[in-house]
Amino acid sequence: GVPCLCDSDGPSVRGNTLSGTVWVFGCPSGWHICTSDGPTIGSCCKK
């Protein structure tokens, strides 16, 4: 999957670990959305 920036990772992608994964059709079972304002396409989810 494509990595994405969770709220807990910091304010920007520079120098921060991207702990989320983009899921186009929503988070799979056992995962949760980790952003307050999600990406334009899909959801940024983490385990």
From Swiss-Prot:
One of its GO terms (cellular component) is nematocyst. Its main location: secreted. Keywords: Disulfide bond, Ion channel impairing toxin, Nematocyst, Neurotoxin, Secreted, Toxin, Voltage-gated sodium channel impairing toxin. GO terms for biological process: regulation of signal transduction. The keyword Disulfide bond applies. Pfam families: Toxin_4. Disulfide bonds join C4-C44, C6-C34, C27-C45. One of its GO terms (molecular function) is toxin activity. Binds to the sodium channels Nav1.1/SCN1A (EC(50)=453 nM), Nav1.5/SCN5A (EC(50)=440 nM) and Nav1.6/SCN8A (EC(50)=1740 nM), thereby delaying their inactivation. Also inhibits Nav1.2/SCN2A, Nav1.3/SCN3A, and Nav1.4/SCN4A, but to a lesser extent. Toxin effect on Nav1.1 and Nav1.6 (and on Nav1.5, but in a lesser extent) consists in an incomplete inactivation. Belongs to the sea anemone sodium channel inhibitory toxin family. Type I subfamily. Negative results: does not show activity on Nav1.7/SCN9A. This is Delta-actitoxin-Bcg1d. It comes from Bunodosoma cangicum. The lineage of its organism: Eukaryota, Metazoa, Cnidaria, Anthozoa, Hexacorallia.
